[in-house]
Regions:
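Chalcogenol-based redox active-site neighborhoods
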Residues: 1-164
Length: 164
């Protein structure tokens, strides 16, 4: 079950790969400055995940205008995320939760991803969204067991506009 609205967001530091090289992103660096949109997704190089991240790229200025920073989080390693980002021209900062700790801390890790296919993949992130305010408190939370269901971006934008 995902963390509830009103809960203090668990802090984390995760790696990302930028054009300048590897970099560590710490969630709490945004506290006191910016709202944060965390978008957990199962895996890079998959259809719905590509659709989600690619559709966000042209909308990033809108999120910046709402005083929000956007991070995509998956269990892929940062080099795979970078390759996917370059191939698909994804502008969202992608963070690697390679050990699935952050997905577990936020209550959005599958016990078994696609069990009907016997993939044996525990810990994969469910498609989820969290809006965290400048005080580090979760103001919006959404998670789906259906990896094909995109988050409700209208509700996310409405919450961010409210927090602006």
């Amino acid at each position: 079950m995902p963390l509830a609205v009103g809960t203090k967001a668990p802090d984390f530091t995760l790696p990302t790969k930028t054009a300048e090289g590897p970099k560590q992103i710490k969630l709490s660096d945004n506290f006191g400055k910016k709202n944060t949109l965390l978008l957990f997704f199962p895996m890079a190089f998959t259809g719905t995940c590509t659709e989600e991240m690619c559709s966000l790229t042209p909308a990033l200025p809108n999120y910046e205008g709402m005083n929000a920073v956007v991070y995509g989080i998956s269990g892929d390693n940062p080099f795979a995320q970078e390759a996917w980002s370059q191939k698909e021209k994804i502008g969202v900062a992608l963070l690697s939760d390679y050990e699935h700790k952050v997905a577990r801390d936020y209550g959005v890790a599958y016990d078994s991803f696609l069990p009907q296919k016997n993939l044996g993949m525990a810990g994969v992130a469910k498609r989820s969204a969290f809006v965290i305010d400048t005080n580090g408190v979760i103001q919006y939370a959404e998670s789906s067991d259906d990896p094909g269901q995109l988050p409700n971006f209208d509700k996310i934008k409405a919450k961010l506009a409210e927090l602006k």
